């Protein structure tokens, strides 16, 4: 009976250790994905602001050209 208890505790302990390792790896992967998403959203924001600035400059130039005629 004592042998059965020891082996059961060993199995439970090893299962908990492997579970905690898997959870840690999962958290690391989620953190990496979040960083990549943040970087991509920053790039998109920068791209949109550049497009907006170019469109505003083109609009001003077009209005200036129409005003001169």
Curated annotation (Swiss-Prot):
Instruction: Give the range the annotation lists for the signal sequence.
Output: 1-22
What does the UniProt keyword field contain? Amidation, Amphibian defense peptide, Antibiotic, Antimicrobial, Cleavage on pair of basic residues, Secreted, Signal
- Region of interest (Disordered), ranges: 24-44
Q: Kindly list the places in or outside the cell where this protein is found, as annotated in its UniProt entry.
A: Secreted
Output the superkingdom of the source species: Eukaryota
**PTM annotation (Leucine amide): residues:** 66
Has UniProt tagged this entry with the keyword Hydrolase?
Answer: no
Task: Cite the Pfam families for this sequence.
Answer: DD_K (PF12121), FSAP_sig_propep (PF03032)
- What cellular component GO annotations does this protein have? extracellular region
**Composition skew (Acidic residues), residue ranges:** 30-40
> What tissue specificity does the UniProt entry give?
Expressed by the skin glands.
| Residues passing through the membrane, by range | none
Q: Is Secreted one of the keywords UniProt gives this record? A: yes
- List, in alphabetical order, the GO biological process terms annotated in this UniProt record: defense response to bacterium
Q: Which family does it belong to?
A: Belongs to the frog skin active peptide (FSAP) family. Dermaseptin subfamily.
Role this protein plays: Possesses a potent antimicrobial activity against Gram-positive and Gram-negative bacteria. Probably acts by disturbing membrane functions with its amphipathic structure.
| Name listed for the protein in its UniProt record | Dermaseptin-H3
Its taxonomic path starts at: Eukaryota, Metazoa, Chordata, Craniata, Vertebrata
Q: Which gene encodes it?
A: dpp-H3
């Amino acid at each position: 009976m004592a042998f059965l208890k020891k082996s059961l505790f060993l199995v439970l302990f090893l299962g908990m250790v492997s579970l905690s390792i898997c959870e840690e790896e999962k958290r690391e992967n989620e953190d990496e994905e979040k960083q990549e998403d943040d970087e991509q959203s920053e790039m998109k924001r920068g791209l949109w602001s550049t497009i907006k600035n170019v469109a505003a400059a083109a609009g001003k130039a077009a209005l200036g050209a129409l005003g001169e005629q």
